[in-house]
């Protein structure tokens, strides 16, 4: 099974050995949508069998955001509350909505009552703190997650409920 391989190195679309722009765009769309759905990158064990950490209902509450921060963070959570002007949000949705079936108007600055709320100041984001964002499922699975509040790095984490959502993501 070679998904997207047909045009990846297509010499009629690009130089030999160079990934085509078409393939790069499709790969970016697919990756962002996988993260939106599952909350993490694709994971495999040493035998290349898929590993599926629990899917949690996560909302980011971001201070000092901007358009770039919204673009980087939005796929990594189910909802994001961010202090940026509405026209910036609308521009992001207009640009990104054609790339996903997820309704972005239901993901940005909506009051929902998320299971887990993660609050932080975007001005304090670093490569280290971004690595936590990419691993919330693993972090929560590796600890005895309970209702309550705690801090980790730059993040204030409020756990309202502990529920797993991965079974709702598979349609048979």
Task: Give the location of each predicted region.
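Short, surface-exposed beta-strand/loop "edge" segments at domain boundaries and coil↔beta transitions
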Residues: 68-71, 90, 124-129
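C-terminal, non-catalytic tails of nucleotide-sugar-dependent glycosyltransferases
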Residues: 5-68, 75-90, 95-111, 146-172
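Short, well-ordered secondary-structure micro-motifs within conserved domains or adaptor modules
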Residues: 105-141, 151, 155
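A short, conserved alpha-helix in the catalytic core of glycosyltransferases
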Residues: 1-3
């Amino acid at each position: 099974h070679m998904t997207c391989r047909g045009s990846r190195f297509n010499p009629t679309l690009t130089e030999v050995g160079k990934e085509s722009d078409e393939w790069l765009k499709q790969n970016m769309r697919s990756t962002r949508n996988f993260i939106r759905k599952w909350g993490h990158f694709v994971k495999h064990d040493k035998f290349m069998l898929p590993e599926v950490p629990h899917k949690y209902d996560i909302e980011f509450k971001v201070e000092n955001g901007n358009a770039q921060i919204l673009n980087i963070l939005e796929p990594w959570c189910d909802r994001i509350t961010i202090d940026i002007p509405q026209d910036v949000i609308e521009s992001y949705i207009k640009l990104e909505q054609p790339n996903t079936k997820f309704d972005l108007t239901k993901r940005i600055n909506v009051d929902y009552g998320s299971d887990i709320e993660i609050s932080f100041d975007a001005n304090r984001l670093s490569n280290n703190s971004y690595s936590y964002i990419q691993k919330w499922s693993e972090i929560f699975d590796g600890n005895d997650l309970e209702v309550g509040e705690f801090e980790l790095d730059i993040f204030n984490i409020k756990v309202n409920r502990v529920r797993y959502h991965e079974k709702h993501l598979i349609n048979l």
